[in-house]
Each structure stands twice: as structure tokens, then as C-alpha cells.
Amino acid sequence: MSSKISDLTSTQNKPLLVTQQLIEKYYEQILGTSQNIIPILNPKNKFIRPSKDNSDVERVEEDAGKRLQTGKNKTTNKVNFNLDTGNEDKLDDDQETVTENENNDIEMVETDEGEDERQGSSLASKCKSFLYNVFVGNYERDILIDKVCSQKQHAMSFEEWCSAGARLDDLTGKTEWKQKLESPLYDYKLIKDLTSRMREERLNRNYAQLLYIIRTNWVRNLGNMGNVNLYRHSHVGTKYLIDEYMMESRLALESLMESDLDDSYLLGILQQTRRNIGRTALVLSGGGTFGLFHIGVLGTLFELDLLPRVISGSSAGAIVASILSVHHKEEIPVLLNHILDKEFNIFKDDKQKSESENLLIKISRFFKNGTWFDNKHLVNTMIEFLGDLTFREAYNRTGKILNITVSPASLFEQPRLLNNLTAPNVLIWSAVCASCSLPGIFPSSPLYEKDPKTGERKPWTGSSSVKFVDGSVDNDLPISRLSEMFNVDHIIACQVNIHVFPFLKLSLSCVGGEIEDEFSARLKQNLSSIYNFMANEAIHILEIGSEMGIAKNALTKLRSVLSQQYSGDITILPDMCMLFRIKELLSNPTKEFLLREITNGAKATWPKVSIIQNHCGQEFALDKAISYIKGRMIVTSSLKTPFQFADSVIGLIKAPEQTSDESKNPENSTLLTRTPTKGDNHISNVLDDNLLESESTNSLLLLRENASTYGRSPSGFRPRYSITSASLNPRHQRRKSDTISTSRRPAKSFSFSVASPTSRMLRQSSKINGHPPPILQKKTSMGRLMFPMDAKTYDPESHELIPHSASIETPAMVDKKLHFGRKSRYLRHMNKKWVSSSNILYTDSDKEDHPTLRLISNFDSDAMIHSDLAGNFRRHSIDGRPPSQATKSSPFRSRPSSSTQHKSTTSFTQ
């Protein structure tokens, strides 16, 4: 049973072989329609990949020779049988003897001739091999290398490609280079030392020191290990030391997940580490129908679990990015099959008309509107795939951050990057159509948004006259904008623009999967310098023409095309053979075209996988660890509503546990539940929380001075320490906005974010205290934590409400029922009569003329003295009970005016 369960688990954890199935379909279709290649089928009629190896050719020839020899034998036996039966009575014994002797002589001669031929062929092959080894090299090894290269070229999956590449490294001696640590391309000593330190701390289970090493040493390009030149010396992979470092990093995170460190503390440190490393974005360029090349790239990264969370697209890249970003992981295989089976019609006006009639329609449209195609078919296709989803809805559905670039049609606006932050209610299909509106090809298109309440569609800017064109014109790869918004510092670019990628083929950054010598690398570098010089000169000429007023709009757009950056840290490019298919640039894609581009995209991504794994391995591992910790915090916390996380400093945090009395007697618990009202519109959705983390200053709140005291208890009880002040209520709820002047309902939250504005205790009324307390006005460091205090039992009947009509009296008339918790220096200085118990009185009103008195109680003075945070109570907020529970009046009375009497509420906290 256990073996079956393990097998089932292993099959469930296997990656979805999306690209492999599509590549197999491509070869099946190509081989089935080709006249020169015959598909090979096994006995079960299953397709077998054709191979151009010599071994396959020899096997086929050998099988053919056997079949020919068998046929000859069958024919000879048949003829002899017929002759024997026909002449059986006519042959005598002498003739039979002569015939047998002749047959024996013929067989002996044929045997001798066959042996001589075999000896001659073996001798010739030996001589050829000897001469080749003397003057050229190892003949047999070169033949084997050719066979393995053919296997690598015709691989149908990434695993087959990797195995063929590793075998090539063994045959060519590149494995020795990978095993050798020393290289001038990176700091091997630093990486080796850090790897050994992490392994030592992990094996010794010194988790605090291991976490410190991770926090202070993990960066993306440690010791220049991200140098792309490290990946042009082998067919697959790079130095084994780098692979060992990445493996040890994953093992370190796995050990921390199983450690006894506090989840909130561990979560904060890992979030800071991820912010220090940065974030990766996948950027897809335009390129007409050749943009379907991106499907193979996304499919490969998806099945290898290397797909970044931030995805951006322009023009054709926006189509692919939007369709794949709005679907769940389980929907991707079905989606790809639907794309293959669909018959697209984007560039043809009317299918029922002939080509000449459609051409006349295009010519008339071009002279009338200045565009060659109409975008109505594109709009219908995008609505079919995307529906009326907005950027916010797509993010809430899949968690992917979709970005689409559009360029303004005029000179008076700036290029825009549309996502769920800048355009949350914009319809994605309208953004895609605007990003595909290449001047002269498609007309400019407006952006539409959906009203979140009514669902009504309307122009985004309020006017349909504001239109946008192809995003590739001004910002094909929005690298700087992504860096500003999402802390992106690493770009994986896929470039298929027909006027760009041939020049990028000469760039040094486009390496991986192929062996390049120093001469080729230097030649590429020189050619790249020449290209940059010519581009700068052309940009200068265009600037001069634009300033002179010669076709200012056109020259400005052309200058933007030449001046922008088209490559990233890792750039995936198609093969140069795409240039010979330029006539398919603006044609409706067929099934064969789709399969070919998907196959080319997948095979172009395979050489970059090892670079992506080493560049982004720690980042993706941290993302998984952070998600795992957040999920564990949700499961282990006794929470009744997820909306409380919307206002916490980090997205998810544990709530304090109830006391033993409260757990035994839930009826006596002071837990208050909040009921939403009509006036309370501040109800956030967890999925609409911050995309990444809070501000960088807020993350410092999770750094504690003594991390060793926050480990897990052996008994199973895990103490949870809030990053804010302690509260009597064991639940963290949101507070209403301070700008609301109406009476506040019974609130449930005593916890304020340390980064939130100053609480009401700092704005104490001067009419009561005379002057503000200097101690309470001091702000503590952003990195100091406030430890929770043990809550005492509270009897709601022992306290009374303050009526609205009461006037404020002197401190000498204070009732003995009201007490103070800890003796603050200011209160001791004002009047010692105030201090008699463990309660704190303060005002909770923004208006000094009509303050509202509230009471803080149930704080343990011993715990407060021990915590050494006596002056930091300013973050607590206690909301009162409803006025209907008031029974007696208090000697502290206030007289609000009649105009504001209904706005003030005085109560005590349960």
C-alpha cells in the first residue's frame, strides 16, 4: 500500500509535459506530410522519433539485407521444389550426384568470396581509421559525437536534450573543465567558502547562524557567478561548484522550514532576503505572428517551474502573456489544445471573398484610413479568450502580475505600463488590442474599463478620442518601469522582432548550449560595438530632423524604436531561419505554423535553462518558502476571518492565543466580533493586498535583538509575539479611519502598526493634563518590538459609563473605581492621587473642546516593568461599549455642546 501511495504521489508531482506533447505532434504532422522522410513505427504503431544517426542507417540497411536474403532463399527453395517435383521421375542417380556436387562447389566459392570481402572491408576501415587518427583525430569518437549531436538536435524533451548534452561534454572533455574549480571568470574561493559554511551550519543544526548567513550573503550575482561567459564552454550547465552552491542553498531553506524558529521571525528575515536579491520578470517582445514563438518559451518555463510571477508583453507578446496569465495551472494543457484546434482569422477581411477582392478592400482602407488591416477580428478573438476580465480580476484569479505596454498616438502623452496597480479596472482585451495597433497596420485603439459596481463598459480616460498604438514603438521591453514598480532587477527577455534579433545574435549575452571559442566571442563583441555606433549616429540624425520640424511625429517614433533596449540579462532568440519565412509575418497562423513556432520556442529555451536556474534559483526557492510559511501560519492560527490580515505590517501574522480561562469559558471571553455596517466601506480583500511586501522600513520591524528566545516550545505551545503593542483582545481587527467623526462602534483591535500614524494617546487633551506628556511623545525605533502582556480578567459590571452631559471635574474628585496600571513618570509628577490601581485613563477624540474619555485596564504592571517598554503605550486603542449598557455616572463628566453631543461616545472596554 505504501509503495502505491508513493507511486501515486510521484506521478502527481511530475511536471506537466506540455511542450513534449506538442513537439511530438509537430514531428508527426511534418513526417506524415513530408515526401522525403518516412515515419518509423514500432510494432504497436506508435511514432518513433526519426534519427539521422549512422547507427539507424546501418540498422535499416541490415534489416533490408536480411529481408532481401530471406526473399532470395524463399524464391530459390520454391524453384528447386518445383523442379524436383516436375522432374522427379526423369532424374537418375548420376544427375542427382552431379547436381549436389555443383551446388556444394558454388556454396564454397560464395563463402570464400564473402570472407574475402569482409576481410577487405575491415582492412580498409582499419586503414581509414589509422590515417584519420594520425592526421585528424579519433575517428570513432568523432562518429559518436556526430551521433550524439544528432540526438540532441532531434530531442523531444528537456530531459533528452540534457542527457545528450552531458554525453557530449564527456566526449569532448568539457566535463573536466566543469569539475575544475579555478577560473578567472568568477570568484571560486568565495563561493566555495560560503557553500562549506552553509553545509556546516546546516549539519550542526545551528539555525540562527544559518539564517544570518542567508540574510547577509545571498545575492544574485555572488562572486560574478552570473557571468554569461561561464556558459559558453560546455554544452549544458557550468562549473559544478556553482551547481553545488545552488543545491546547498535549497537544502538550507528546507532545513529552516523544519527548524524550531518562530514563523513570524523567519518570515520577516526571508522577506528581507528576497528583497535584497531582487525580483525577476519575463518580458515578451512583439513580432507579428512570429510572436507565437513565445508560447514555446512560456510552456518550457511553466513545466520546469521557472516561470516568474511578473510577466510583461508588447504587441504579439501581450497576446501570449495575457492569455496564459489569466488561466490556472491546470487549465494550460486544455488551453494549448484549444489554441491548436482553433482556426484564426485576424488578417483576412472576408473568408467568402477571393484574395483579389480582399486585396482591393485593403487598398481602399489604406488610402482612406491609413491602415492596411481592420482590428475587428482581433478584438473578437481577444474577447473570446479573455472575456471581460480586468487586470485586478486576473491578478486575483491567478496571482500573476500581468503588464502590457502601450504607446500614445500623439506626442503629448507618455508611454504607459498597464497592470493591476496603474489600471486595475481596464479590460485586458482592450489593452491587448491597443498594444497591437502598429501604425500603418492596425488603427489606433482606445482603452476601456469596467465599472467595478455596475459592470458598465466605458472609456478609461473618460474620452474615446485618446487612443494608443503598438507598445513596441516606445517601450518594447519596459525594464526601467518594472524596476520602479516591482523591485525587478533581473530580466528574462524573449525577442522575436524581425528587425532586432539578427543583430542580437551577435551579442555576448546570448550564449548557452553551444561551444564558443575566444575568437568568436571577441568577434561578436567587436560587431556589437559597430552596431551600437551606427545606431547612435542614426538616432542623432533623427533628433536633428525632429528638431527641424521634418515629420516630427514619425521621426520621434522611429528614434524611440532605435534608442530603446531590446535585450535583458538573459535573452532568448529564435533561429536565423525565421528570416526566410518573413512572408508569414502578417498571415493567419495555421496549425502547422503554431506547432513549428512552439517547437522552435521550446528548443531555444532549453540552452538557457541552466542559466535561469543559477540566476533565479534562490529567488524562486525563497518565494516557495515564504508561501509555505504563510500557509502554515494560517493553518496553525485559530482565525475566524481572513480580513484581519489586510492592515497588518506583513501580509499574514499569527493572532495571540487566548488565555486558559477564555479557552475553558468562551462565554466569559472578552473577544468581540465586528459586524460590518453600511458606513464601513473599508473592507479589503486579501488578494488585493500589496503585491510584494510592505515598505522596506516596515520589514525592519521583524528584526529582533535576541532571536534565540523565539524558538518553538517543546511542549507544542508556540508563543507568538506581535510586532505591535500588546492588547487585551486576542484578535487583530482593523480600526476605522481617524477621519470619521461619527461615534465609533465597539471595536475589537488594540493593535496598531508601528509604522501607522501617531495614536490618540499622543494627542491627549490639554484641558485635562495641562501639557502633553514628554515621555509619551517620544517615538521608539522602528526596529523595537513590543511584547504582549498577560491579560487579567475583566468584569464589565464593575465599571460604569460616563454620560454625555457630565462635566469634567478636577483630579481630586476621581472615583476610586478608576485606576492606573503602571505609574508613569508624568502621572506621578502631576498627582499621586491618580495612581491607585491598574487602569489608565486617556482621551480618544480629535477635538480638544469635547474630548471623549476612555479607559485602558487589565495590564500587568510586573510584566510592563519587565518588558522595559513603559513609555510605548501610545499605540493602544480601546473602543467602548454601547451607551445602552451604561448604569451609573462617573465623577469625570464632560459637557459637549448640543451640536456635537450625538457625535461623542464614552464607554469602557470589555
From Swiss-Prot:
Protein name in the entry: Triacylglycerol lipase 4
Summary of pH dependence: Optimum pH is 7-9 for the lysophosphatidic acid acyltransferase (LPAAT) reaction.
Comp. bias (Polar residues): 70-85, 666-683, 739-768, 900-910
Region ranges (Disordered): 51-120, 657-683, 713-777, 874-910
Record's compositionally biased regions (Low complexity): 889-899
Phosphothreonine PTM positions: T675
Intracellular or extracellular location(s): Lipid droplet
EC number: 3.1.1.3
Activity regulation summary: Phosphorylated and activated by cyclin-dependent kinase 1 (Cdk1/CDC28). Loses its lipolytic activity in cells lacking nonpolar lipids, but retains its side activity as lysophospholipid acyltransferase.
Domain called PNPLA: residue spans: 282-483
Gene Ontology molecular function terms on file: calcium-independent phospholipase A2 activity; lysophosphatidic acid acyltransferase activity; sterol ester esterase activity; triacylglycerol lipase activity
Sites of Phosphoserine modification: S55, S737, S749, S751, S836, S890
Pfam families: DUF3336, Patatin
Gene Ontology biological process terms from the UniProt entry: cell budding; phospholipid metabolic process; sporulation resulting in formation of a cellular spore; triglyceride catabolic process; triglyceride mobilization
Reactions catalysed: a triacylglycerol + H2O = a diacylglycerol + a fatty acid + H(+); 1,2,3-tri-(9Z-octadecenoyl)-glycerol + H2O = di-(9Z)-octadecenoylglycerol + (9Z)-octadecenoate + H(+); 1,2-dihexadecanoyl-sn-glycero-3-phosphocholine + H2O = 1-hexadecanoyl-sn-glycero-3-phosphocholine + hexadecanoate + H(+); cholesteryl (9Z-octadecenoate) + H2O = cholesterol + (9Z)-octadecenoate + H(+)
UniProt modification remark: Phosphorylation at Thr-675 and Ser-890 by Cdk1/CDC28 stimulates enzyme activity in vivo.
